[in-house]
Every structure is written in structure tokens, then in C-alpha cells.
A protein has these predicted regions:
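Acidic, mature catalytic/reactive cores of soluble proteins
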Residues: 1-417, 422, 473-476
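Intrinsically disordered, polybasic Lys/Arg-rich low-complexity tracts
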Residues: 398-476
Length: 476
């Protein structure tokens, strides 16, 4: 009992500022169930548990507060229930093509806390099973094609996070190769290969090592548009050119298929069309389907606007990471501004938390669930990225300062030696100065004697010597 009490006290947060309020809110999403189950409630007051949102939320709502055990318990709950190499329920690729791939992204964040060895030991079998399931195909809806890309399609079931349905039909039909699904697929395969290579799983490496290059080549070929950004999906009718935020995921993962030039084009497009102070719009305002507000209207109209305009905070973490990866510390002021934009929200709508989504048009009114797990997790994740970059900037500045200080003593030493040399005689001890004066006087006397000797008349040679000299000159 004492241990439970101590653990409970340790988990308490003091709501004294913006971040501490969000940390307190984050604790409320993690639920302990009977039977050693740990789940993540997607949002309050009406959302339940979602596999996709669990994976996306976990790093921000657990790891950023130092509660890695909660993250591990939630993952273990889902892994224990896997069947035939796949998660069950709404975490299955059969109904959510991207959900199992977010599992790999979550593990990448967890690795920073526990190390790659522990990740591969605990979750390597599940990772390999999931990849094999995609290779075999899932539920007749998800398949890995020969070009290395994942195809997901279902007539009446939206297979991605844009899953609103009106009258039994998806609001945003995206059957085909979805941009974020395939970005996550590439990231998952590369991450599994990295861990397998480090921990001597030669069989897995041999079976999968040729796939990433094929996936990357196909992705760039199919998704890159002449306009510079990425298609939202590529279906039977070709690429869909709607400007949507899903392409930013391809720039915000650890393993990317895009070169720096294409990443910049994607970031520029997102910044120009989709970025708001509260999140990324789900559609460009230039699109005829765009809806800037959820105000009024029927539930169907609000569902339509939610995926055709409304701004979602959870996407911002991938935009911020993508910008940091390209601009590094130069992006810090903008990242701080993005974080500060949510400060006022904890005093309205969902007190002390971040809501599900916002209107895409000013004044960006709060909408949806008053407290959403992946919104809170994303903002806390952004805060963590800013903190890490700030610390790195401080270390670099400190290192540069030490280097500058190291140069100054060298310059001073050189100047000092020159000054010492110049004033050496003045600074000599008296005995040394006296010895120098005596030596100087002796040298002067020696020089005077030499000059005196040179002034004496030259001694005459004997006559025989003169004759010999003359004979030598004439040669006779």
C-alpha cells in the first residue's frame, strides 16, 4: 500500500503554468483496467479507445513526463492481443491501414528511453509479424505491391485517419496508395532493418534489405507532382492533387524517402496553404470543397468540414520536426511561437487541456472534444523538441565561447613574450646588470686595442724576399 501511495504521489502534477496543466491533462488519458490492461482514451467527453490515436498519443502523454512504464504497459496490452501477426479491433490494418505502422513510430520514441536492444528484445517479434502481415495482405483490403508500396482500399470503410462517414460513405475517399501510409511503411521497414542489423538477425535483414530502395523509387515517381508537392494519394485514376496535410508526415519521420529539395517544397506548400496558429488545415482554402468553420449546420455538414478544412493540432508535431530537421536551430523562434499559440486555450473551452480540432478560418474557434489525447501529446512533444534544441544551442554556444577564450591567452602570451624581450635589460637583477656592464667594457677595450695595432707601420721585407716576390710575378 505504501508503494502504491508513493507512486501515486510521484505522479501528481502541480498546475502552475501552461505546460504543467497539459502534463496534468496527459495523465487523465491513461487508464488502468482490470486484467493488467492499460489503455489510452482518445478524448473527453465522448471518445473511446483507438489504436491509431493510442500510438500517436503515447510519446507525448507519457514519455515526455518520464512515465515510460505507462507507454510500455499500453503497448504490451495491444501486443498481447495480436492475432495472426496483426493487432485486433480498430488497431488492425484491416480497418486502419496506417495504425500498425504508427506502432513503429512509437517504438522509435521509446527507444530513446530504453535503448534499441530492449526494443528489439521486447517488440522485435511483433515488428516482424506485422511487416509479414502487410506482405501477405490484410483482410483483402491492404496489400504490398511489387513496386514496394502499400495499397489500401475498401468501398465503404475509410482506411486512414480521415475516417468521417456520411450516409455510409467516406467523406474523403482515398482508396489506393496513401501518402502517409507509405511514408510510415518505409519508416517501419527501415527501422526494423536497423535494429535487426545491430542485433545480428541476419535472416530478417536478408529477407527485407532490398525493399526500401524499391519503395523509395516508386514513391517519388508516383507521388511527386509537377507543382512541387506530393499527391495526397494515388488511385486507379492517378494522383489526387488535393493539397492536404498528410504529406507532411513524409517529412517528419526519422526515415524519409524525400531529398532535401523536395522536403523544402512540401514544407513551403504546407506553410502557405495549411498552417494555422492552431494546427494544419485538412484542405487548402483554394479548393472548392474547403469549409473554414464548423459553426452551425447539421452533423453531416460538420463531419464534412472536419476533414475538408478544419485545423488539427496533432499534425503540427510533424511539421515542427520537419522544419527542425531542415533549418535546425534557426527554426526555434517559430517553434516557440507555435507552442505559445496554445497557451490561451487552457483557460477556455476545455479548461487546462487542448481540444480535438479548430476552425480553419480566424478566429480559429475550438471544436470537437474538449480534451483530446493526441492534441495534448503533440503540443507536449513540440515543447520537448524546443527544449532539446534550446539545450543543444546552449551547449554549442558554450563550446564556441570556450574556443574563443582559448584563443585570447595565446595572443596574450605572444604579446607578453615580446614585451619581456624588449625590456629584458631593464628587468635584470643588479648582479646580472653589473656582469653585463663589465663584459661590455672588456669588449670595448679589446676593440680599441685591435684598432691601435692596425695603425702600426708595416715591417720591411728582406731584399731576398723582394727578389723572390718579383721572380714569382714575372715567372722568370
Amino acid at each position: 500500500i505504501e508503494e502504491v501511495f508513493a507512486a501515486s504521489i510521484a505522479r501528481r502534477t502541480h498546475k502552475i503554468d501552461f505546460i504543467s496543466c497539459l502534463e496534468h491533462s496527459a495523465r487523465q488519458f491513461v487508464i488502468r483496467r482490470p486484467g493488467d490492461r492499460t489503455e489510452v482514451v482518445s478524448g473527453y467527453p465522448w471518445h473511446g479507445v483507438s489504436g491509431r490515436q493510442t500510438f500517436v498519443s503515447l510519446p507525448g502523454i507519457t514519455l515526455e513526463q518520464g512515465h515510460k512504464e505507462d507507454c510500455i504497459d499500453a503497448l504490451d496490452t495491444l501486443v498481447r492481443e495480436m492475432r495472426d501477426g496483426m493487432f485486433t479491433g480498430n488497431a488492425s490494418a484491416a480497418v486502419a491501414a496506417d495504425a500498425p505502422l504508427w506502432f513503429f513510430w512509437t517504438l522509435q520514441q521509446l527507444e530513446r528511453e530504453v535503448g534499441g536492444k530492449q526494443i528489439w528484445k521486447a517488440y522485435g517479434p511483433a515488428m516482424k509479424d506485422i511487416l509479414e502481415s502487410y506482405r501477405r495482405g490484410v483482410g483483402g483490403r491492404v496489400a504490398l505491391h511489387d513496386n514496394g508500396l502499400v495499397w489500401a482500399a475498401a468501398d465503404d470503410i475509410p482506411m486512414t485517419w480521415m475516417n468521417a462517414v456520411i450516409d455510409g460513405r467516406p467523406v474523403t475517399p482515398r482508396n489506393g496508395y496513401q501518402v502517409e501510409v507509405n511514408a510510415l511503411w518505409y519508416n517501419a521497414v527501415c527501422y526494423a532493418l536497423e535494429l535487426a542489423g545491430k542485433h545480428a538477425d541476419k535472416a530478417f535483414v536478408k529477407a527485407w534489405e532490398s525493399l526500401p530502395a524499391r519503395t523509395q523509387a516508386s514513391f517519388v515517381e508516383l507521388f511527386r507532382l509537377p507543382e512541387g508537392y506530393l499527391a495526397d494519394f494515388v488511385g486507379t485514376d492517378g494522383p489526387d492533387k488535393s493539397t492536404r496535410p498528410n504529406m507532411i508526415v513524409a517529412c517528419g519521420l526519422d526515415y524519409k524517402m524525400l531529398d532535401e529539395e523536395l522536403q523544402l517544397e512540401v514544407i513551403r506548400t504546407v506553410r502557405q496553404h495549411l498552417l494555422t496558429p492552431k494546427g494544419l488545415r485538412t484542405l487548402s482554402p483554394r479548393n472548392l470543397l474547403y469549409k473554414g468553420s464548423l459553426e452551425g449546420g447539421s452533423p453531416a455538414e460538420r463531419d464534412f468540414a472536419g476533414k475538408n478544412g478544419s485545423a488539427w493540432p496533432w499534425l503540427l508535431q510533424f511539421y515542427v520536426k520537419a522544419c527542425f530537421d531542415i533549418d535546425r536551430d534557426v527554426f526555434l523562434p517559430q517553434a516557440r511561437e507555435i507552442l505559445a499559440n496554445f497557451d490561451e486555450d487552457i483557460q477556455s473551452y476545455g479548461i487546462g487541456s487542448i481540444c480535438e480540432l479548430y476552425d480553419a478560418d480566424p478566429p480559429y474557434a475550438s471544436r470537437g472534444a474538449i480534451s483530446q489525447a493526441w492534441s495534448v501529446g503533440a503540443v507536449l512533444n513540440i515543447h520537448s523538441m524546443i527544449r532539446e534544441r534550446t539545450q543543444e544551442e546552449a551547449r554549442e554556444s558554450k563550446t564556441a565561447g570556450k574556443a574563443a577564450k582559448a584563443v585570447k591567452p595565446v595572443a596574450k602570451s605572444i604579446a607578453k613574450k615580446a614585451a619581456v624581450k624588449k625590456t629584458a635589460t631593464d628587468n635584470m637583477p643588479k648582479k646580472t646588470a653589473a656582469k653585463t656592464a663589465i663584459a661590455k667594457e672588456a669588449a670595448e677595450k679589446k676593440s680599441a686595442a685591435k684598432k691601435s695595432a692596425e695603425k702600426k707601420p708595416t715591417e720591411k721585407k728582406p731584399a731576398a724576399t723582394k727578389a723572390a716576390t718579383k721572380k714569382t710575378k714575372t715567372g722568370k
